[in-house]
Amino acid sequence: MGQKVNPIGLRVGVIRTWDSRWYAKGQQYYENLHEDIRLRKFLKDKLKNAGVAKIEMERAAKKIKIIISTARPGVVIGKKGSGIDALKAEVQKLTPNEVFLSIQEVRKPDLDAQLVAESIAQQLEKRISWRRALKKSIAAAIKGGVRGIKIRVSGRLDGAEIARSEWYNEKSVPLHTLRADIDYGTAESLTAYGIIGLKVWIYKGDILSAREVEEAGRVKS
């Protein structure tokens, strides 16, 4: 099953938390969900050059806090905060709730699966060889200290008549192990030959429970 499902969704409630954190019932749940989807799409489109890795949302009463994880916070914040003020004003027009924006920097974009996928997609659109782009991204991730990385690229590679999928991986990526911290990202690249799809899995190590950490300490002592 670990091979087929989204590895982040599989681990929610085990070692991962939800990107949208709020509680609602009935019609309010429906409205909140659709508003989250609409806001995420707007922010991803608006900040497509800012290297946005993740957008989290928290709600309380009539307030919504949006946490944007980005590799280029300066692009979002702008000179003297003018960028984030303008962005907040635009987001506020899309929701009746009071909006609060929080910007978090992704210090190691080479270790973030979503940013790696988008980086490769951008390189393919610039007509860089897909093999070269994949190998470069894998080398950067391994150098950064990941425990394993796997990339799948699908489409009319090298302009071939028939679409195919290619896999590149380095070290292990244990998809079936729920305590394994696996990041996952997808992206699409619009090339002259059609759309190239990308999927990236990055294994960062195991997340142990407090009990497991205590037991491991006893074994070492």
UniProtKB/Swiss-Prot annotation:
Q: Which domain of life is it from?
A: Bacteria
Q: Which InterPro entries match?
A: KH_dom, KH_dom-like_a/b, KH_dom_type_2, KH_sf_prok-type, Ribosomal_S3_C_sf, Ribosomal_uS3_bac-typ, Ribosomal_uS3_C
Q: Where is the KH type-2 domain?
A: 39-107
Keyword annotations for this protein, in alphabetical order, are: Ribonucleoprotein, Ribosomal protein, RNA-binding, rRNA-binding
Q: Which GO terms describe its molecular function?
A: mRNA binding; rRNA binding; structural constituent of ribosome
Q: Which GO terms describe its biological process?
A: translation
Q: Write out the GO cellular component annotations.
A: cytosolic small ribosomal subunit
The reply on keyword Cell membrane is: no
> Residues of the signal sequence?
none
Q: Which residues cross the membrane?
A: none
Instruction: Give the family this protein belongs to, as stated in its UniProt record.
Output: Belongs to the universal ribosomal protein uS3 family.
The role this protein plays is: Binds the lower part of the 30S subunit head. Binds mRNA in the 70S ribosome, positioning it for translation.
Q: How does it assemble?
A: Part of the 30S ribosomal subunit. Forms a tight complex with proteins S10 and S14.
This chain's protein is named Small ribosomal subunit protein uS3
This chain is encoded by the gene named rpsC
